[in-house]
């Protein structure tokens, strides 16, 4: 059989007419057997549409593709980013697990950079600066923005951090209009310092601050940062080519995180991720949540034919998690060729999307309950929320449980307009509390789940060539928008350029 895929297709065919309530009735211990606790994180896969026999076939698929060996190669610093010839060592930013010379060197370098970062924070603490403007886009923005927003209520930092990513000048203006330049510092985050959005927004910030005295950079190209913005070397923090943007919040890209929540909280975030790394590397496939989560995604995509995947965060502090995961998953897995350049032989990543509960119940949940598509989902909540509004938290979690149950089980009615067909599989993820440790572990779990899927599909999760062509074309079209004579081949683009130029 084709590396286990044919056997799994037989199981999918066998289960086609089986409902999720049927599975729960057939496996009475399913709620416990399909649950896992990893530190402060609880996972329950009982409402996924597979049984124990199909699940064993999924684990066989993982063994056939040597997922365990793939984890070991990544953690040891082998060049698993084969298209760019690079190691992938974001895990070494938060811990040394493999003991190889490459990983140890990476961990040591990252620790030294954090020491420098904390020294810069101490210097800012002694100044009159109260606000930080962080300029970056994609992985230089989404991760830090998520963590700062999620952990703001337990922050130990004294700085208010404001994020600007969009090249639309309205975003920068809206931010600067509420700040005092004499009490503001800026951070420009770009691996290459060639990102158009960051350079344009950085120039606005440089001018508004009156120079580079309170301007910092996080980059793998310090010379370009110095040339473009006169940023002195002592205010530049390095990053490396073995850390991809969407995996970089653990590096100096996390500078705005540490400023916002404090150095100790940032270390707790790293520790939570490192704890999950150790778990992912050492726990057998059959018990490994990251492997199970990744295999479940493959099952829903390739054997149930689900073209989208939703993330529902039932905690307002995690409102940015669906957007963060959208980049992590779709930029990593949105590939049409394998590592060897041959076309993939099955569908890869579905469209990831989502929102925050209970708001989503009043927007797109109608389509989930009574539409024509089956949409697998992750529901993410917190067990304990140490705020003043405990009644609200009870109501939030009641809605969380109710929606999962109805989406899976449905409800019949004599009135066709009131039929809930059910059949939507979901995974429940609960954090004991939204702490830096729990958030770090949660993000690490998703990183490793993505890697598992990439190994099964035979694709490279660590490049993103698909984002390049549009950026290059935009640079070529910019002079034409300014009125310069530029040859434009596409007839529609030519016509629209004339309208944009007035």
UniProtKB/Swiss-Prot annotation:
Q: Where in the cell is it found?
A: Cytoplasm
Q: Which UniProt keywords apply?
A: Cytoplasm, Gluconeogenesis, Glycolysis, Isomerase
Matching entries from Pfam families are given as:
PGI
Q: Does the keyword Cytoplasm apply?
A: yes
Q: Which GO terms describe its biological process?
A: gluconeogenesis; glucose 6-phosphate metabolic process; glycolytic process
Q: Which PROSITE patterns match?
A: P_GLUCOSE_ISOMERASE_1, P_GLUCOSE_ISOMERASE_2, P_GLUCOSE_ISOMERASE_3
* Pathway per the UniProt entry: Carbohydrate biosynthesis; gluconeogenesis; Carbohydrate degradation; glycolysis; D-glyceraldehyde 3-phosphate and glycerone phosphate from D-glucose: step 2/4
Gene Ontology MF term list: carbohydrate derivative binding; glucose-6-phosphate isomerase activity; monosaccharide binding
Q: What is its EC number?
A: 5.3.1.9
Membership in a protein family: Belongs to the GPI family.
Protein name, as recorded: Glucose-6-phosphate isomerase
């Amino acid at each position: 059989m084709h590396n286990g895929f044919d056997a799994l297709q037989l199981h999918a065919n066998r289960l086609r007419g089986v409902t999720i309530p049927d599975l729960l009735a057939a496996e009475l211990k399913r709620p416990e057997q399909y649950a896992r606790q990893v530190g402060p994180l609880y996972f329950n896969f009982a409402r996924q549409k597979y049984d124990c026999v199909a699940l064993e076939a999924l684990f066989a698929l993982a063994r056939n593709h040597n997922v365990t060996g793939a984890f070991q190669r990544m953690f040891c610093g082998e060049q698993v980013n084969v298209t760019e010839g690079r190691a992938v060592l974001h895990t070494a930013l938060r811990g040394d697990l493999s003991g190889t010379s490459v990983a140890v060197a990476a961990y040591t370098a990252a620790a030294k950079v954090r020491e420098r970062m904390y020294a810069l924070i101490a210097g800012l603490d002694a100044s009159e600066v109260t606000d930080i403007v962080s300029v970056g886009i994609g992985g230089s923005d989404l991760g830090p923005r998520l963590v700062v927003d999620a952990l703001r209520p337990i922050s130990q930092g004294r700085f208010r951090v404001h994020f600007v990513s969009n090249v639309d000048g309205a975003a920068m203006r809206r931010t600067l209009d509420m700040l005092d330049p004499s009490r503001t510092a800026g951070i420009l985050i770009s691996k290459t310092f060639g990102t158009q959005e960051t350079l344009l927004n950085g120039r606005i910030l440089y001018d508004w601050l009156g120079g580079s005295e309170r301007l910092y950079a996080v980059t793998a190209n310090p010379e370009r940062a110095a040339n473009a913005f006169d940023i002195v070397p002592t205010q530049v923090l390095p990053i490396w080519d073995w850390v991809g943007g969407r995996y970089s919040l653990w590096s100096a890209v996390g500078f705005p995180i540490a400023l916002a929540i404090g150095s100790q909280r940032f270390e707790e975030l790293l520790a939570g991720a490192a704890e999950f790394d150790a778990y992912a590397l050492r726990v057998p496939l059959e018990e490994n949540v990251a492997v199970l989560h990744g295999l479940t995604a493959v099952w829903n995509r390739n054997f149930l034919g689900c073209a989208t995947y939703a993330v529902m965060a039932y905690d307002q502090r995690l409102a940015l998690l669906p957007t963060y995961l959208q980049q992590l998953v779709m930029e990593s897995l949105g590939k049409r060729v394998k590592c060897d350049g041959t076309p993939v032989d099955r569908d890869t990543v579905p469209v990831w999307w989502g929102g925050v509960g209970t708001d989503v119940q009043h927007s797109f949940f109608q389509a989930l309950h009574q539409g024509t598509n089956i949409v697998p989902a992750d529901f993410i909540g917190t067990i304990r929320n140490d705020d003043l509004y405990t009644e609200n938290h009870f109501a939030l979690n009641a809605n969380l449980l109710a929606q999962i149950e109805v989406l899976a089980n449905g409800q019949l009615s004599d009135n066709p307009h009131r039929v809930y067909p059910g059949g939507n599989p979901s995974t429940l993820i609960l954090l004991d509390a939204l702490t830096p440790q729990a958030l770090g572990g949660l993000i690490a779990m998703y990183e490793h789940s993505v890697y598992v899927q990439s190994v099964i599909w035979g694709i490279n999760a660590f490049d993103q060539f698909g984002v390049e062509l549009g950026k290059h074309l935009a640079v070529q079209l910019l002079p034409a928008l300014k009125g310069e004579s530029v040859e434009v081949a596409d007839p529609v683009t030519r016509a629209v350029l004339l309208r944009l130029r007035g």
